């Protein structure tokens, strides 16, 4: 979550007249994340999240995102719900941006997740994949193999400013993935961004998943690889096989991976590491100075990518035979 677009109290109060949510008591911007502008609202009834959708989010995709949250919640997944306006619509406009009110989900994200938390994340990810079945709106993954080349071209000329030799390394990685990317794996709705700050816990109990604004249709095991990258590396860059084993066991307790998915994990993990490296690289090079945004280090994901290149078998991630 982040703040790119400022709002005034008067404009916000006018916006809230379109909703049955009580009286505004206070609001503040939320600085975490890099995509939309988000605010925590306290009203006379309930706390709420206000999201203003910035230019990177296509307005045509919003029915998918908001409808998906409704669908998943109806299937028993704990996630925020978009609140309808008095006219029944889920979207309004504020400060020149499409905007929505979202229910507030209790819990906190974990700064230092342990293996037991990774197991719960694996279970929740698999539960989301199962719950997503039957959702009839489709959204291709614009940040998968086909989209990486275009994203790279936006940063390629300045890549060696971040680390010498980066241009040649990433060109080679794109060539490899273009030739070896798995096809015909089970697919469905994926979260595509299930980092620790998008998973809430109350104590050791997972209370819900948030931030579905990268969700799309893709191979389900690709989502697993994203979580391995996001949850199972330590701050020193080392892969924690205990966390990996817990996450994968949790996932397979709900939705067992096929042999083909297991075999593809090293390549999928290279791809998901590259995907987050490329978006972080672009943001690192282009985010305006002074924006209320937390920029993330692209080299963290370059190191993860290099780790996955050395993997000979998915057993090295913690998968039991």
UniProtKB/Swiss-Prot annotation:
Q: Which Gene3D superfamilies match?
A: 3.90.1200.10, Phosphorylase Kinase, domain 1
**Native organism:** Rhizobium rhizogenes (strain K84 / ATCC BAA-868)
The taxonomy runs: Bacteria, Pseudomonadati, Pseudomonadota, Alphaproteobacteria, Hyphomicrobiales
Q: Which family does the entry's similarity section mention?
A: Belongs to the pseudomonas-type ThrB family.
Q: Which NCBIfam families match?
A: PRK05231.1, thrB_alt
Which pathway features in its UniProt record?
Answer: Amino-acid biosynthesis; L-threonine biosynthesis; L-threonine from L-aspartate: step 4/5
HAMAP family cross-referenced by the UniProt entry = Homoser_kinase_2 (MF_00301)
A GO BP entry is: threonine biosynthetic process
Q: Which Pfam families match?
A: APH (PF01636)
Q: What is this protein called?
A: Homoserine kinase
- Gene name, per UniProt, is thrB
**Reactions accelerated catalytically:** L-homoserine + ATP = O-phospho-L-homoserine + ADP + H(+)
Q: Give the EC number.
A: 2.7.1.39
Whether DNA repair counts among this entry's keywords is: no
Classification via InterPro entries: Aminoglycoside_PTrfase (IPR002575), Homoserine_kinase_II (IPR005280), Kinase-like_dom_sf (IPR011009), Pseudomonas-type_ThrB (IPR050249)
**Molecular function terms from GO:** ATP binding; homoserine kinase activity
Q: Which UniProt keywords apply?
A: Amino-acid biosynthesis, ATP-binding, Kinase, Nucleotide-binding, Threonine biosynthesis, Transferase
Keyword Transcription in the entry? The reply is no
Instruction: Give, as one word, the top-level EC class.
Output: transferase
């Amino acid at each position: 979550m982040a703040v790119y677009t400022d709002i005034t109290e008067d404009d916000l109060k006018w916006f809230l007249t379109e909703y049955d949510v009580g009286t505004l008591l206070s609001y503040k911007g939320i600085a975490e994340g890099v995509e939309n502008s988000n605010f925590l609202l306290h009203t006379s009834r309930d706390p709420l999240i206000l999201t203003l959708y910035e230019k990177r989010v296509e307005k045509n995709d919003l029915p998918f995102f908001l409808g998906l949250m409704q669908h998943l919640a109806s299937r028993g997944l704990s996630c925020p719900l978009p609140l309808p306006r008095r006219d029944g619509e889920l979207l309004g406009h504020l400060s020149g941006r499409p905007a929505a009110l979202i229910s507030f989900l209790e819990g906190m994200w974990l700064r230092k997740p342990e293996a037991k938390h990774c197991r719960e994340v694996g279970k929740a990810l698999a539960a989301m994949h199962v719950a997503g079945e039957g959702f009839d709106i489709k959204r291709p993954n614009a940040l998968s193999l086909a989209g990486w080349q275009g994203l790279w071209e936006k940063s390629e000329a300045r890549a060696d400013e971040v680390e010498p030799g980066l241009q040649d390394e990433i060109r080679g990685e794109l060539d490899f993935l273009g030739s070896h990317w798995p096809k015909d794996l089970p697919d469905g709705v994926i979260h595509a961004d299930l980092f620790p700050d998008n998973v809430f816990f109350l104590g050791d109990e997972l209370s819900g998943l948030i931030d579905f604004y990268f969700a799309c249709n893709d191979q389900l095991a690709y989502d697993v690889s994203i979580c391995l990258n996001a949850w199972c590396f330590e701050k020193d860059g080392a892969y924690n096989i205990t966390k990996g084993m817990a996450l994968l066991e949790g996932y397979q307790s709900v939705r067992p991976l096929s042999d083909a998915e297991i075999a593809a994990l090293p390549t999928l993990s290279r791809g998901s590491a590259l995907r987050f490296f490329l978006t972080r690289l672009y943001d690192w090079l282009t985010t305006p100075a002074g924006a209320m945004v937390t920029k993330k280090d692209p080299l963290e994901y370059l190191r993860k990518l290099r780790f996955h290149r050395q993997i000979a078998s998915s057993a090295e991630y913690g998968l039991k035979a």
